[in-house]
């Protein structure tokens, strides 16, 4: 069994050793829930990594969006280069669920675009969980959505060992049942080809390696891993396990049984709708379901097959669907990062999905069983989750209730950096005062973050500062991901001095060059000026040894009082630690991972090409598809050097797209 092994120049420091020991003690004492209160810059990811290494347990890390998940994935991959660090998020680049609007009698068909790179990574994640124990899966909250049954997924594998006999026709038929496509010309992921005594398989979890099965009659002589572009043999394998090209692969008997049960439910539904005098709905559900049944009979699948998933997994009505949590070993460990955001997201997912599907069922577009194709209810997730460590600088009531109010604090930063000094100034004439503060901050070589309450105010302030010849940009929800990364890069490199926004709490906005955070209208109680929001915003200045925060307020609110009190408490703890050990706070430059990926692309493409390429996701996808075709064409023409260059460029773009998704 492989053990987790951290490869790093750093050792736990500050509060980290104590926090690691306390969390591990709680895990050993069978505590189901623990709270790691980690502030900005305290090394939460490195602390999690050390807990994983010492407990040596398979781990799932949940984040509340793809961007944060990608950031944690990149960091964990660099910390654990010898172990399986996997990425599991929604594989849709674009997703429009089917829906019906009764008021206007409009039915919207499901429309989606699947990201092949992320689909590959999802397969790699489930394969790792089934084959090894040194696994870390970093996931968004989409991991609570239905996935194929792990029992069926593993049952449908094809296990191969040299020296054993495998009737070739049966093997080819098994590959088709695993939803692999025979393609003797265009060999790509999810395909197989037959050449003489060789069967080449391109596994669903690889992008640059395939397997060559060499037969003598029905006897499997060798299994070689090879480069599908150049044909170069890389290594001889002792065995190979081929997993399905979809998480929803099913044996023929399961499909036939499901067809029978779907027909039975259809007849019950028709009888019910007729009893309600809903003739249009009766005709609609009969026509749509009969078409799906014909497709299932002929091909084993149909459009929207996931709506019949309950019949394929053998679950009863109302039972939770199989999810990634069922792939986890019983002794797995769960970290919920930024839990104050992630937990409410999990709680909200079921209700939104249910409301949309109930309308479809009511109006005859779907059978009632479609309601069981859903994310987990919050109570189900709470029941399924293994031993859990919630991680947040601002824990919410749920986490505190789960841990009985106990928290493990990660406050002392190894860098010695203090929480920023907080100053309250009158909101009257706040803009005039801000201009003076901006001038003095920029003079020191630092940049400024300004947060407002409304989009209109942010736009007006940006225009005003630009008129005063300050290099100012505006961050808002309409800014595409790549453009957002470019703005942050410009801010860090000094091309921009001031960034104005409404909600500057988004992850990845940790900027060591930030010398001032200005919070306008700080006394306007609400979501953007709550205690949690204020603490998170104040934290944006915590990576600079000279960082300051100015709160413009005409009155002291409870949120301001609590936020400043908590900030001062943390500042005092760090100060005492620094004095005791003679630590001098020092600003540490930190590379933004997505930024690094963007710079990788910039090094291979000129700036204009990069900007045009990433202007929108459709352009990026089209360019990646074009490069892939060029790569395959070069390989088929035996131009292997050119094909390898294109493959490297393609891989760089796909990694960048993943970071920027």
Curated annotation (Swiss-Prot):
The beta-hairpin motif is involved in DNA binding. ATP binds at residues 38-45. It comes from Rickettsia bellii (strain OSU 85-389). Residues 430-592 form the Helicase C-terminal domain. The UvrABC repair system catalyzes the recognition and processing of DNA lesions. A damage recognition complex composed of 2 UvrA and 2 UvrB subunits scans DNA for abnormalities. Upon binding of the UvrA(2)B(2) complex to a putative damaged site, the DNA wraps around one UvrB monomer. DNA wrap is dependent on ATP binding by UvrB and probably causes local melting of the DNA helix, facilitating insertion of UvrB beta-hairpin between the DNA strands. Then UvrB probes one DNA strand for the presence of a lesion. This is UvrABC system protein B. Disulfide bonds: none annotated. Belongs to the UvrB family. Residues 25-182 form the Helicase ATP-binding domain. GO terms for biological process: nucleotide-excision repair; SOS response. Pfam families: Helicase_C, ResIII, UVR, UvrB, UvrB_inter. PANTHER family: UVRABC SYSTEM PROTEIN B. The gene is uvrB. One of its GO terms (molecular function) is DNA binding. A motif (Beta-hairpin) lies at residues 91-114. Keywords: ATP-binding, Cytoplasm, DNA damage, DNA excision, DNA repair, Excision nuclease, Helicase, Hydrolase, Nucleotide-binding, SOS response. One of its GO terms (cellular component) is cytoplasm. It is found in: Cytoplasm. Residues 621-656 form the UVR domain. Forms a heterotetramer with UvrA during the search for lesions. Interacts with UvrC in an incision complex. NCBIfam families: PRK05298.1, uvrb. SUPFAM superfamilies: C-terminal UvrC-binding domain of UvrB (SSF46600), P-loop containing nucleoside triphosphate hydrolases (SSF52540).
